[in-house]
Amino acid sequence: MSPDHEPSIPDTADLGLRSDCGSCFGLCCVALPFAASADFAIDKDAGRPCPNLQTDFRCGIHADLRPRGFSGCTVFDCFGAGQKVSQVTFGGQDWRRAPGTARQMFDVFPVMRQLHELLWYLAEALTLPAARPVHADLRAALEKTEALTRGSAQELTALEVPAHRGEVNALLLRTSELVRAAVPGRKKERRGADLMGARLKGADLRGANLRGAYLIAADLKGADLRSADLIGADLRDADLSGADLTGALFLTQAQLNAARGDAAAKLPETLSRPAHWRPAGDR
């Protein structure tokens, strides 16, 4: 574990924030829409099952999603919301056997995903020693958010998620400030910046504020992103080969999945190296 992080209970495993597709009713393959693009081979409306979804709720082309034009599927991460909706909110009753629940189940899924994403950030914030001054508030927010995920389908669809997200975000901002303040040197403030295609090879971005930055196709090879705040940063097709992301704040698996990289990149221990990343030194 990075020295900038410390253990905390509950952690992401306790909160069920890892996707368990075997316990889900293929909700991301049905509930969400997508359009034919570089990420998806076809158009699909919300609520319509993807033609690749099998009767057992498994993907029929899972091993070949990228070559078949469905790279967007390999990027998506529900933070465990799929199995929570399937097994907890709807008690293991699937939308095929109980079609009357389908619309409500599909409406609940994106709400649950947002709540689980917030839980991911809050759980991470609670592992950060520098954020101890706000740990009590963070834990209270985590407990409140977790309680919301246990609500009924009706309660979840009626939830004002933006208002709750705003409350949580204020705490995450404070957490970020506390952690990045401990990083020596002048920190770059690039929140929401347009850095699409930017040449940042080898850049010193330690403690940088890159919240919501557009880093699409940016060259970040060998960049030092330790303790940089990457919440909401768009890393699609960014090259993270050889970059140091240890201790990066609020980085998610979906962001890594959307980027390019290699075996030399250093990642937070809570995240996995995407299967499509290259071996070290392979160009």
What do the predicted segments below correspond to?
Residues M1-A136, A140-E167, L171-A182:
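Hydrophobic scaffolds flanking metal-cofactor catalytic centers in soluble metalloenzymes
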Residues L173, A181-R283:
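Tandem repeat scaffolds
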